[in-house]
Each structure stands twice: as structure tokens, then as C-alpha cells.
Design a protein with these regions (language model features):
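Sec-dependent N-terminal signal peptides
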Residues: 3-13
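C-terminal and inter-domain tail/linker signature
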Residues: 15-183
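Short, Lys/Arg-enriched, disordered terminal segments
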Residues: 1-3, 183
Length: 183
């Protein structure tokens, strides 16, 4: 009987191991530091120090796909030097999970809203986003951004502030044709 109880205890404890969030908590600080580099005042040098040289990053920019270190730093520079008064609001930080086992794997993900202004035009933006980070040896080695980057850039561009001009109705009116012209 005592072996049966022991077997039951071992089985239950082996099957119900609590998720270890220690790695997530360590990586969370690195991910938060990376996000904060985009907020005003931006800090590209600190951001560079957080990125692994072999990073693979899913870009939010249309047509970019997965990019490496140089392209990721180029995109970061574009945002950091092109926008001011940037904040990341309504943050919801969550542990990432292994897609096979659904156990926490130390990765980090976050939902939030970016707000700021274009330095070139002064136009403001607000865009909801999702980001994920996998961290290796204290640096981000796999990450991704999901938000409407192209729409955000178009919304704050100088051309977005101009209004369409009225066209001359004579230029767009359909022309009449006679039956003889169509034969």
C-alpha cells in the first residue's frame, strides 16, 4: 500500500511540474530595455548592444520579411531618428510558449500601442502592435514586429497632409460616341 501511495505521489508531481518563469523574468528585462530604446529619448547604441549579430527579425515593413542585423538596425535607426515624443502604452507583457508543448520557453511577447510624432511633418500617429523576442546569451536573437508600419508612415508623411484637388468635370466626363464612330 505504501508503494502505491508513493507511486501516486511521484506520478502526480512528475506530471504537474510548475512552469519555471525565472528565464522569462530575466529575458523580460532585456525585452523591456529594447522597447524602451524606441521611446523618447531614443537610444540606438543601447539597442544595438541588445541585438545578437545573427538575429533573425520578422519586419513589420511591407515586403521585408525576415531580416538580419544590418536591416534591423537600419529600421530601428529610421524609427528612432524619424519620430519624437514616442511612447509605448497599454503594455501587456506575456511569457512565450513552446508551440509543441505549450510550456513557457523563456521567450517574451508584448501587445501595446505606439504613439508619437513625425519629426519631418509634425503629424502624430497611434498604432497597435505585437512584438515577440527570443533571447540567447543576453541578446535578442529572434524577434518580430506586427503592426501597420506602412500605414503609419503614410499617415504621417507630407503627402498625407495634402488634400486632393478638385478635377475639372469636363476632364472626367464620359464622351459621347455616335453609332457611326463605333463601327
Amino acid at each position: 500500500m505504501k508503494y502505491l501511495v508513493l507511486l501516486l505521489v511521484v506520478t502526480l508531481t512528475a506530471c504537474n511540474q510548475p512552469d519555471d518563469l525565472a528565464l522569462y523574468k530575466t529575458n523580460l528585462e532585456i525585452a523591456k530595455k529594447g522597447i524602451s530604446c524606441y521611446e523618447s529619448p531614443a537610444n540606438l547604441e543601447v539597442y544595438k548592444s541588445l541585438i545578437h549579430p545573427d538575429v533573425k527579425h520578422q519586419s513589420a515593413m511591407y515586403g521585408q520579411g525576415i531580416v538580419g542585423y544590418e536591416d534591423l538596425i537600419g529600421q530601428a535607426k529610421f524609427y528612432m531618428e524619424g519620430f519624437t515624443n514616442v511612447t509605448f502604452e497599454n503594455q501587456l507583457w506575456l511569457p512565450g510558449v513552446d508551440t509543441t508543448t505549450l510550456a513557457t520557453d523563456g521567450s517574451v511577447r508584448v501587445y501595446g500601442t505606439w504613439k508619437g510624432e513625425s519629426i519631418a511633418t509634425g503629424a502624430s500617429f497611434s498604432v497597435d502592435s505585437y512584438h515577440y523576442f527570443h533571447i540567447k546569451d543576453g541578446q535578442i536573437d529572434f524577434s518580430g514586429d506586427y503592426f501597420d508600419a506602412t500605414g503609419m508612415v503614410q499617415a504621417v508623411s507630407a503627402s498625407a497632409e495634402t488634400t486632393p484637388t478638385e478635377t475639372d468635370p469636363a476632364e472626367t466626363a464620359p464622351t459621347e460616341t455616335t453609332p457611326a464612330e463605333t463601327e
